[in-house]
Amino acid sequence: MKPTKRNKLTIASLLLSTCFLLVPGAHAQDNVIAAKDVEWGYLNPARGDKSPGAADLWGDRTKDTATGMLVRFNKGFESPPHIHNITYRGIVIEGEMHNDDPNAAKMWMPTGSFWTQPAGEDHTTAANDKTNLIYLEIDEGPYLVKPSKEHFDNGERPINVHADNMVWLQKSDLVNIAANGVSVAYLWGETSSVYGTLVKLPKGFKGSIKSNGDEFKAVVIKGSLNYTQNNTPRQIELNAGSYIESSTAAHHSVENANQSETIVYVRTSSKFSVAD
């Protein structure tokens, strides 16, 4: 069939439409999970309801891959001394947590506190409040619990940072801040590769978090955000424990409509920016 002007126009239109689909948009490859939609299981399925609850937000804790998960503990929970096969990081979302050497006095860490637990290091974990929830992150898996007798020294040392000792900066090489009242706290990693920070958004903040790399993961640690998706009027309420992810450059439109600050944990492979 001989191409006509109409056929050529149709083909050109299809090609142009395809090009627009391939260009990374403001919300391309976004994945948003509200805390209320998280699917829960057990951190140690063999122990059933005696085990802390666990929910993968990204990755798979049972496989050899990086993973971010929520873990919840009942009041009075205290583990026996144990080790893990891999290093993990923990951030308290709700309640009070203790994580230290088996002989250490209890230091209860509230919302916004951060700790690291090196692979092979003997320790116990305890929870003090009625409801206790943390975000736990690993760079490799699977996440396993092993007896203390198998302890080893992997060369790393544990860190416990109480929320009151967090250092907040309004100017940093971690992130470009172009909004009043926004501050960040460095937690781990190298800014030339993958790193983690806490971002504090003041009450009334309305703006965007712009990610530029191929990995951007954010978890609401304290407070809540209204998230506008795909440039539509539709807003998603993201309470503590909710999750945002993008794998291309993206603008994440967020609003803190609370009467208090909201804190978000960000894991990223590239410098990001916050603007109102």
Task: Kindly give the residue locations of the regions a language model identified.
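Short acidic-glycine-tyrosine-enriched beta hairpin
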Residues: P102-G120, N230-A249
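Conserved short histidine dyad/triad with adjacent acidic residue
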Residues: W58, D64-I83, W108, T116-G120, ...
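Hydrophobic, ordered structural segments
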Residues: G90-N154
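Ligand-binding loop in jelly-roll beta-barrel domains
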Residues: A119-P142, D214, N239, T248-F272
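A short, N-terminal "cap"/entry segment at the start of jelly-roll beta-barrel domains
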Residues: H27-T67, L144-S193
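Bacterial N-terminal signal peptides that target proteins for export
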Residues: K2-S13
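Glycine- and acidic-residue-biased ligand/ion/polar-headgroup-sensing regions
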Residues: N74-F77, H84-P102, P202-F205, I209-N231
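Bacterial N-terminal signal peptides
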Residues: A12-L21
